[in-house]
Amino acid sequence: MTAPRYDVDAIATVEEYLDRSDWRVNANANQGYSLGGLILNSAGKIVANYWLEHVYTPEIGAPHREGDYHIHDLDMFAGYCAGWSLKRLIQEGFNGVGGAIASAPPRHFSSACGQIVNFLGTLQNEWAGAQAFSSFDTYMAPFVRLDNMEYEEIVQCMQELIYNLNVPSRWGSQCPFTNLTFDWTCPDDLADEHPLIGDEVVDFTYGELQREMNLINRAFIEVMTGGDADGRVFTFPIPTYNITPDFDWEGENVDALFDMTAKYGLPYFQNFINSDLDPHMIRSMCCRLQLDLRELLKRGNGLFGSAELTGSIGVVTLNRARLGYLYKGDEEGLVARMDELIDLASKSLEIKRETIQYHMDHGLFPYSQRYLGTLDNHFSTIGVNGMNEMVRNFSDDAYDLTDPRGFDMCVRILDRVRERMVQLQEATGHMYNLEATPAEGTTYRFAKEDRKRFPDIIQAGTPEEPYYTNSSQLPVAYTDDPFQALEDQEVLQGKYTGGTVLHLYMGERVSSGEACKEMVRRSLTAFKVPYITITPTFSICPVHGYLAGEHFTCDKCAAAHPDAEPQACEVWTRVMGYFRPVQSFNIGKKGEYHERQMFSETAADAHGELVSAFPPAGSR
């Protein structure tokens, strides 16, 4: 039987974008309505059909078209995300591609910042998702000493770095999606190493540069906390901070870090105090020649970060809500169908790996070939979406995942997926990981497709704004107590070996940096969760700038000009992993926002003793 052809209607494609009738126009809150967006959206349909009709087999393409799973980034002929070695860029410079401008290794802090911007912006155009550097403060510290820099000079360079990383310079008029990880204190495995700067080995070690690291962190925090000229937050780079057992909670810059977090909620906090994460894995992935395929490794550095010279070749997310609906009361049948979908997802990822590697070898991704060369250390990623709605449909809405029966089912399902990951690693020789995929557009696509096919399926949201709860997260209106959420999510969060994070959505600015610090400290020391964020809601008025909390119109403007039209404001919060205005969310994510019960400090303060599902670290 011949597979049906899906020809792209050029006129309809352009008009659907221009009149915004195509749901993809707002699927990604980082991509504004623009000429670049029109070009990407139009070209993306051609590329997606190329993948589905020419590269993948019909048996792989059909479940995507029908909504059984979602093959991410079909509109881009590229791998998903990548972590790069900042040390290598500093030592070698940005060069090595024929016919392109070549930069020698940087000798100064300012030129290193310039090469970082150029590198991330250029590599972003060879990948679909996040681009990451680890140990930013450690690797940049030698320049501060060699240049004998004043603090104000560092701030100026940091302003240029951050502003330039927030310019919509990539395909589709988007900002490069970037992540920087900060060590805060020099890691043990780098402490005795002498940096190589400008082809010369310096006479000091990374471990002697704590003062310079402190200046870099202080400057970065100052610029990010200040926001742009209108008081608007910088969306990128997303900062990840490594919180290790020796993290000094009363040390230099800590108050500034948590003042920034209380106001804007920008950082991801990576838990090296009380989790399975190993700080040295950030750098060791790129030099492990023999990986044990019987174990599941962690990608490192959070939902949008990757350890050095690793990342993900691609992501396939399973529609769990549909499985719960189709196999109501039949867990054995549900698991059997899930296994079939995982096998197909794996086939798609193996084909993608082979395809992208072939074209990397033949010059389509020249900078990735220069600085990476091989995809051997890149994971194949399988994710889940709508575990809560899976349970609700499976039980005919008798219970959800907050019920012990639903929770236990989710644990069994995730353990089965992990088991399959190991089998796939041994069968293919490639690394696999399980991710709580952000599914920003996917959650709405799944809900929309399921509503068409199964009108009585149980969904979150409303008929006008349907969505599925992300991964195995709690229902968004379940509790206002962040510590209750941590207690209930700790076990499930630990099942993921790719990106996962628990966002603590706060209704407004946390009352103080000290209160914010205490919330993070208690969370990371009490619970074995790999990553958390504090995510306050805030608003931006064109006249008054930053306003704490949700304000779709400005009260200050109304008080000053009671007879004038209300002054509209942007309301900002995380759309999964990064901050964007709620007004730019897709329909499903708006539905989620409207239903979300925000966490409160009052509820957190009243919680009492924190109870972990695991024994304390010292007793294990």
Show the residue positions of the predicted features.
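Conserved catalytic cores of very large enzyme subunits
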Residues: 2-376, 397, 403-562, 571
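Metallocofactor- and cofactor-centric catalytic cores in central/energy metabolism, strongly enriched
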Residues: 154-158, 162, 393, 580, ...
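Short alpha-helix boundary/capping elements
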Residues: 188, 395, 576-580
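Residue-level signature of transmembrane alpha-helix interfaces in integral membrane proteins
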Residues: 199, 399, 449-451, 590-596, ...
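Extended amphipathic alpha-helical segments enriched in small hydrophobics
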Residues: 378, 382-391
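Glycine-centered flexibility sites
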Residues: 383-386, 498, 577, 588
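Intrinsic, low-complexity terminal and presequence regions
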Residues: 539-620
